[in-house]
Amino acid sequence: MPMRKRHFYRLLPLASLLLAACTIPVSKGPATSPTSPQWRQHEQQLQQLGQFETRGAFAYLSDKQKVYARFFWQQTSPERYRLLLTNPLGSTELELVVQPGVTQLTDNQGKRYVSDDPQEMIQKLTGMSIPLESLRQWILGLPGDTSDFTLDDKYRLKKLTYQQNGVTWVVDYQEYNTQVTPSLPSRLELNQDGQRIKLKMDSWTIK
């Protein structure tokens, strides 16, 4: 019995140390606030990207239709860009060319349409609701006209919520390409009332 008691008392200090170790607070790391200098620096680098190209996979999913395509996005200035959607065989399904004050859309039959509102035109002709004006910035990892967003531990966009005219879009940034500087999104998903748009960027070219 005495032997057992001594053994028991010897274990007490060790048990106390283990309990104390379990209560030591763990550092949560640096705050990733939208006002942090690291985010401001990253944001400024993205805003300076006036010309770029990216290509990859596009998916539009809703109760009414499902569209899968390859896409090519070419931006030559903040107000000039081209969006090309092609099918698995490489044939053009849709080409959108946007310039200040005028937008031209060419469908898979070669018919051309002109408008001053690219988002409205693409919705009327294809049935797809794509927030093009905002997507121009979201695709780069910029929040655009919303201040409702969170950052990941690398001070990049993680999630944003954008509301306009009673419509709410939620954008989730799922992966980034760190082979380019600054790092740019490689996978993101847009959600709006049962509609989903998935983009997977296979490559980026910064000019």
Swiss-Prot record:
It is a lipid-anchor. Monomer. Coiled coil: none annotated. Belongs to the LolB family. It is found in: Cell outer membrane. This is Outer-membrane lipoprotein LolB. HAMAP family: LolB (MF_00233). It holds the Pfam family LolB. NCBIfam families: lolB. Keywords: Cell outer membrane, Chaperone, Lipoprotein, Membrane, Palmitate, Protein transport, Signal, Transport. Residues 1-21 form the signal peptide. A lipid is attached at C22 (S-diacylglycerol cysteine). It comes from the Bacteria. One of its GO terms (cellular component) is cell outer membrane. The keyword Membrane applies.
